[in-house]
Amino acid sequence: MSKEKNNINDAAIEAAETAVLETPLTPEEKAETQLFIDANVFYGQSHSRTNPKMNKYILTSKGGMEIIDLAETMRAIREAGEIIKNTIAAGGEVVIAGTTPAGKPIVRALGDKVGVSYVSERWLGGTITNFKTISDRIRYFKKLKADNESGALDKYTKKERVNFNREIAKLTRFFSGIESMDRLPALVIIFGLGGNITPALEARKSKIPSIAFVNTAADPDSVDLAIPVNDRNSESLKFLATYIEKAILAGKAERAKTVVASKIEK
């Protein structure tokens, strides 16, 4: 890393830390904010790329780079946590989308860990707005996999089986994360709006609420709740994913209690 780049980074960190020190926070809140700093959540993009609608989320600029106001980030991520928890507790499904190089491995790991639908490869147009067609493709994918595992495809020629295997591999790439999504989601969570605008547009068109991690170059009005963060850095997204994970698990726990209570009443 160049000396100039180091100086910019040092200045950015100093600006973020100074803001924390000057803000009336409890020791616990300051400690939590420091975790956001350590995870590089506060880095925006260059000032020249800033979307004017993001100005309210920007603390200052250092070396031509925007520094995100972490107070805004933490407020938004807490609000997001409540929305996610309440949506799942009420029986709604969520889908997580993140197809950028920084986001896809984190989205895949999170979805598998907490058992929610996710898209970590290309978001297929119509995943929400043409859900019936997508559902038909998912059913076909699941049947093809089942037939392959049961040996039902053994009756075909070697060439035909090779083609089936290629098709299974292709469909796995696009549908493995959403094969259990049997109804429209009640909430869309986007890891990096800049690289995932299609799910935001489809959610808006279908009147489905959306939450997104948004950098300073994106349009926060494209989603219902924008969380200003550094969405191009895997360390930042991995840290932020822990908040989403906690909210999902809390919602699932509340939902389980409701289901049990309902059965007892019957």
Model regions and ranges:
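Non-catalytic, charged low-complexity extensions flanking SF2 helicase motor domains
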Residues: 262-266
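Ribosome large-subunit tunnel/peptidyl-transferase-proximal elements
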Residues: 2-260
